[in-house]
Swiss-Prot record:
Protein name as it appears in the record: NADH-quinone oxidoreductase subunit H
Gene that encodes the chain: nuoH
Keyword Ribosomal protein: no
Keyword Membrane in annotation: yes
GO molecular function: NADH dehydrogenase activity; oxidoreductase activity, acting on NAD(P)H, quinone or similar compound as acceptor; quinone binding
NCBIfam families reported in the protein's UniProt record: PRK06076.1-2, PRK06076.1-6
Length: 345
């Protein structure tokens, strides 16, 4: 049996099993993310939230998903049927395949490539195509305006995210997530993590992730008071479910990136406790809690304020920080906190 797994067929079986495990983890997490999002929002507003289906309403998300699946798929007259159906599928698939390079410890990763950051950045940049396709194919003014907003918003904040990530790459000398996490390992526990030397960028990265994933207060592409529901106006049933699932999976991915880049990934925050994938999951859950709290307590920005923040505040500050980190890493300022060459770079 052991010899079989060394053959091409056995290797294919292992890869398939690993892929299914990652998909299962993301999809099961998705159910709890939606439930948690609704519960947190309800708690802030002093409501109960989901509490009928299952114990404490835990099965409410499953019931809602089944409701969407059994509904009829309504395609508007005059729309491009092929593109209309492909749009939500594109958003969902692109959100899923980004997880191929996300590690949960030194060995629990589907594809441990040396350009993992570049891969995630490229895939997340492509997700805007699903939104644009959905807005254009609907043949309606509100979806089209929402898709244009989304394209401009995502492109604007991807620049800031990219520059912030470059700062981490300069400190580590690698684009591999495993190397970045190992560079944050040390006897000081959480004080070895990159949140300390890159402290200002943690806030910019988190806010940029909110804008990148169209989360409040930056949910302009689907602003109900202005665009009804934006690019999702004409969608119902399974296509709408795919759009929503893709959005939450992208949010969870940003939580994973924040954990890996700045908070040590699977590393323990205290030296006397062992490192574990559970630390990674706990950190991701904490950052999703912050996503949900921001949604519950902040008002929506105006579109011009959103774009001004991205281009006139975040972009210059991120660019200045990259230059600063480059010099700090080159000359090993601050006791070498910005120069942790885990790969011998």
């Amino acid at each position: 049996m052991a010899e079989f797994f060394n053959t091409p067929g056995g290797i294919a079986v292992i890869i398939l099993a690993q892929t299914l495990a990652v998909v299962a983890f993301v999809m099961i997490s998705l159910l709890f993310l939606v439930y948690g999002d609704r519960k947190i929002w309800a708690a802030v507003q002093m409501r109960r939230g989901p509490n009928v289906v299952g114990v404490y309403g835990l099965l409410q998300t499953v019931a809602d998903a089944l409701k969407y699946v059994v509904k009829e798929v309504v395609i508007p007259a005059g729309s491009d049927r092929t593109v209309f159906i492909l749009a939500p599928l594109t958003s969902f698939v692109l959100a899923m395949i980004a997880w191929a390079v996300i590690p949960f410890n030194d060995t629990w990763v589907l594809s441990d490539i040396n350009v993992a950051i570049l891969y995630v950045f490229a895939v997340s940049s492509l997700e805007v195509y699903g939104v644009i396709m959905g807005g254009w194919a609907s043949n309606s003014k509100y979806p089209f305006l929402g898709s244009l907003r989304s394209a401009a918003q995502m492109i604007s904040y991807e620049v800031s995210i990219g520059l912030i990530i470059i700062g981490v790459i300069l400190s580590t000398g690698s684009m591999n997530f495993g190397d970045i996490v190992r560079a944050q390992d040390g006897d000081a526990g959480l004080f070895n993590w990159y949140w300390l030397p890159h402290f200002p960028m943690v806030f910019l990265f988190f806010i940029s992730c909110l804008a990148e994933t169209n989360r409040p207060p930056f949910d302009l592409p689907e602003a109900e008071s202005e665009l009804v529901a934006g690019y999702q106006v004409e969608y119902s049933s399974t296509p709408f479910l795919l759009f929503m699932a893709g959005e939450y999976i992208a949010i969870f991915l940003m939580c994973a990136l924040t954990s890996l880049l700045f908070f040590g990934g699977w590393l323990s925050p205290v030296p006397f406790l062992p490192d574990s994938p559970l630390w990674m999951v706990a950190k991701m859950a904490f950052f999703f809690f912050l996503f949900a709290m921001v949604k519950a307590i902040t008002p929506r920005y105006r579109y011009d304020q959103l774009m001004r923040l991205g281009w006139k505040v975040f972009l210059p500050f991120s660019l200045i920080w990259v230059v600063f980190v480059a010099f700090a890493a080159r000359f090993e300022w601050f006791w070498g906190a910005f120069a942790r060459w885990s790969t011998g770079g």
